Amino acid sequence: MKGENFTLITGASMGIGRAFAMASAARGFNLILVALPDGQLAEVQTEILSKWKVKVLTFTVDLTQEDAVKALFDFCIEKQLSIDGLINNAGIGTGGRFENISLEKQLQIIDLNNKVLVRMCHYFLPLLKLQEKAYILNMSSMEANLPLPYKAVYTGSKNFVYAFSLALREELKSGPVTVSVVCPGPVVTNAEGLQRMKAHGSRAKLVVLMPDEVAEIGLKGLLKGKTIIIPGKINWVLVKLSRLFPTTTKMRLLERLFRVYSTH
């Protein structure tokens, strides 16, 4: 992922995406950074260029717009960019009773977390297959294995990413493209996330990670060709233990734990 090749990262202006950009630049990877046109992406580009000798291109767009991914793809073709890494990080989520969250918001989650990711893989896979070795990293969640009450659509969307990634990896196993899926637990990416962590008390601090930790572990796992990457040893253990519980018991425990969202 060095030389004149580029790694493309979506949702790169803040949080985990920004951390992936920094971790990639530190390894000498040239970057194509994609995010909403809110001005923050230029700051990320400036910071990277001040620290590392890499090329950084930016593309601002709302990826949920019908032709947005095609516009991004056309940009890369026009620039004749060689891409050997795709990190599908862009995503959104919300918590609350399903019936209390607007249908528009629920569908926005599916649009960005699922439809955009599928479009990105479909458009850019032919470019990745031109390389001797290339990587796709899809951002799922630990919640893909732990369907959470009061986060029904979000956890459903992340379960799709998880299953899609494993299936696509198997389809592509005889070629140059390796697909990995990263399943982080709670990550503090903004003030709202910090408030949520505090609402859960001391238990949350055991599993919560910072964006740079997730990005570093995710990138290492990707480059090693790992299938499933679960940042944080405690989170890894929790996922394994959860499989030992009967589904009914597990769901009751999760409902109690996440009941704090039920008033939203």
Residue ranges of model-derived segments:
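Conserved glycine-rich cofactor-binding loop
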Residues: 11-15
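Conserved glycine-rich Rossmann-like NAD(P)H-binding loop of the short-chain dehydrogenase/reductase
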Residues: 27-43
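Conserved NAD(P)H cofactor-binding loop of Rossmann-fold oxidoreductase domains
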Residues: 89-94
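Substrate-binding pocket helix/loop in short-chain dehydrogenase/reductase
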Residues: 97-110
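Active-site helix of classical SDR
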Residues: 121, 157
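Residue(s) in the substrate-gating loop at a strand-loop-helix junction
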Residues: 141
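SDR active-site lid
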Residues: 174-234
